[in-house]
Design a protein with these regions (language model features):
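Hydrophobic alpha-helical segments, chiefly the membrane-spanning helices
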Residues: 155-163
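Conserved Class I S-adenosyl-L-methionine
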Residues: 133-143
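Core alpha/beta nucleotide-donor-binding catalytic domains of modification enzymes
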Residues: 2-113, 118-133
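Amphipathic alpha-helical oligomerization segments
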Residues: 105, 151-154
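Conserved small/polar residues in nucleotide/adenosyl-binding loops
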Residues: 144-150
Length: 163
């Protein structure tokens, strides 16, 4: 099996790329807009290409990767915030990640990415009485032609907040 590759959206200080390296996955690119986290990853992960703001990234124009990770902003989903949910300005950036994944899948005829990993706060499960999490599950399906049972099975067995 060939080496897995990773692209990280909403990268922050490179948590997903660092975890990828520990798991034998090669980070290729990252999208982040905050200057200090970019400085951190530029120094710690010099092999990582910074592709800019997630709102302007086109998934067809970046290197195709096996895994796309994204921890879209949590402020609007958190129980500590105003709970605007996915309709909020920051947490709504989730939809840009799905767009980028869809663009890459179309450009690679469905070959890449093979995996998409979304991380967020526990409030994402209860935001708007669970309807935001239902949107998180169904939106990628409508874009990428995955099957909902596969996503739900993965969610139950691996990504439960109670695991």
């Amino acid at each position: 099996m060939s080496e897995l590759t990773l692209g990280s959206l909403f990268d922050g200080s490179g948590g997903f790329p660092l975890a990828g390296i520990q798991a034998g996955i090669r980070p290729v690119w990252a999208s982040e807009i905050e200057p200090f986290p970019i400085l951190v990853t530029t120094r710690r992960l010099p092999q990582l290409t910074h592709v800019g703001d997630v709102t302007t990234v086109n998934g067809a124009d970046v290197d195709a990767v096996d895994v796309i990770t994204f921890g879209s902003p949590c402020q609007d989903l958190s129980v500590a915030g105003k709970q605007a949910g996915l309709a909020g300005e920051r947490s709504g950036l989730f939809f840009h990640a799905v767009r980028i994944i869809d663009q890459m899948r179309k450009a690679t005829h469905g070959m890449f990415p093979r995996y998409a990993i979304w991380e967020n706060v526990p409030g994402a499960f209860s935001s708007h009485k669970g309807s935001d999490f239902a949107t998180v599950l169904t939106t990628p399906v409508s874009y990428t032609h995955l099957t909902l049972p596969t996503i739900l099975r993965s969610c139950r067995s691996r990504w439960s907040p109670y695991h």
